[in-house]
C-alpha cells in the first residue's frame, strides 16, 4: 500500500515506476520516475535523504545508472518503493513531485548501439510477401536464429519529435530506372524497444543464461520505414536509408523488474533452436527465453487498426542479444 492518492488501477502506480529524463522551465534535464500524474525528482529526493549515489540521478540521461548493473537497479527500485509506501518519507517525496503537465520529457538514454530485430513471424511473413512475392516469405535461416540489422542510434528521438519525410532513390514498377524524391510509402512499425544496461567486454558476448543481467527495461518504439526506399536499396545487405531517418521511443523506460509478473512462455518453436539459443521456460514464464503479456494498440486518425500481442513473438529479447558484445545504453527493437 502507498500513502499516495492513486487509484488501484492507475497505470503509473508503485508497481510500475518507470524512469525518464525531464526538465522544468529554467532547469537542466535530470532523472525522474513517473508516479501517478507526477514525476518524482529522484536526485533531489536522494540528496535530501543523504544517498551517496545521488549524483547519477542528476545526469541528463540514464546511462550512468545503467552502468551500475542489476544489483544497483534492484536496490534503487526497493528504495523508491520504500519512499512511496512509508509515511516517514512523505514530506520529502511530496516536496519533490512535479506535475506531468509542467515538465518537458527528453530522450531517456544516450543510445550507444541500436539493433532492429525481425522477431515476429507474422510481421516477417507479411513483409516477405510484399518484397518477395514470388518466393517463400520466410528466408531459410529465419527460424534458426534471430535476424536483425544495425540501425542508426543517432536518429533515435523521443516520442513527439517531428519526423521529416526522407528522400532517396526508389524504383516504381512502371519506370525503367530509379527516380529520386520524397518517399511516397512512409510506414510505421509498432514495437517494444529493449534498453541494455550492464556492458560486456569486447570479445565476451552475452550468453543466454546471463541475458537478464544486461536487459534493463522496455520502451515503446516506432520504427519509421520508407518502404519504397527500403525495397530498392535492401538487396543484398539489408535496410539502410529507408530505415535510418528516425526511430521514435517513449520517454518512459519500464524496468524488467516491473515486468516480472508479465512474463509468459514463448509460443512453440519448430524446429527447436540450437542449444545456445534454447531455454525452455516453465509454465509461469520463468527462464530467460520468455514472452511478455503486453499488447500495443495502433490508433490511426482515431481508428484502431491493430492490437499486436507481444506474447506472440517467435523470438524473445534474451536470445536476440546472445552472441553480441554490448555497451550500456545500447538498444534493440523487436
Where are these regions (language model features)?
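Short, surface-exposed charged micro-motifs
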Residues: 31
